[in-house]
Regions:
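Conserved active-site "lid/cap" helical segment
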Residues: 40-86, 130
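General beta-strand structural signal in soluble alpha/beta enzymes
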Residues: 90, 121-124, 142-147, 178
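Glycine-rich phosphate-binding loop plus the immediately following alpha-helix
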Residues: 164-178
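Short beta-strand-loop/turn "lid" adjacent to the catalytic site in phosphate-handling enzymes
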Residues: 76-123, 151-161
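Short glycine-rich, Thr/Ser-proximal phosphate-binding strand/loop in the N-terminal lobe
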Residues: 6, 15-59
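Short glycine-aspartate micro-motif
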Residues: 6-8, 85-89, 144
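Rossmann-like NAD(P)H-binding beta-loop-alpha module
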Residues: 135-139, 145-153, 159
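Residue-level signal for inorganic ion chemistry
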Residues: 10, 34, 88, 148
Length: 178
């Protein structure tokens, strides 16, 4: 059986966390995080075989962060080229009632994430920036959104409606997600 490599991303407003896995053995090959994207004191840390390596350089945006991350994967011999990556998974804060489980990212999914940004304004912009940067870097690789709100989607309605006016649920989508 051939090993395939999958990248997992957790984009933040000024950060990008990532890990590369080899499948099917579920082995983590490298993980890291980039902090203070857009600031002059931007830095990133990689963890390879238990050793932490820190770098510093200004990165203007999430696209530069993704480009830097991909270069680090190649420089550290975790991939020979980006063609080895077979899929990308993104942690997304809020899928509302649209997504009870993980989905392949397409234009409609992006539209829904943008729409739900009003509920998680600190997280979705960075998560969307990560998706868009990966689309540019790995345009032919499938991307999957994994929503925090999927976890309790199977709760009965009487368990996820808050004790607030029902109109808030109907009008604003206010409900318990876990």
């Amino acid at each position: 059986m051939t090993n395939e490599k999958y990248l997992v991303i957790n984009g933040g407003s000024s950060s990008l966390k990532f890990a590369l896995y080899s499948m099917p053995e579920e082995k983590e090959l490298i993980n890291g995080y980039i902090e203070k994207i857009g600031a002059p004191d931007c830095f990133w840390t990689l963890k390879i075989n238990g050793e932490k390596i820190k770098h510093e350089a200004p990165l203007k945006n999430h696209l530069e962060a993704v480009e830097t991350k991909m270069k680090e994967l190649i420089d550290n011999k975790k991939i020979e080229s980006t063609a080895e990556i077979k899929g990308v998974g993104h942690r997304i804060g809020h899928g509302g009632e649209y997504y009870p489980s993980s989905v392949l990212i397409d234009d409609e999914v992006i539209k829904h994430i943008e729409e739900l940004t009003k509920l998680v304004p600190l997280h979705h912009p960075g998560q969307l920036a990560g998706i868009r940067a990966m689309e540019q870097e790995l345009s032919n690789v499938p991307q999957v959104a994994v929503f925090d709100t999927s976890f309790h989607q199977t709760l009965p309605k009487e368990n996820y409606i808050y004790a607030v006016p029902y109109e808030w649920y109907e009008k604003y989508g206010v409900r318990w997600y876990g």
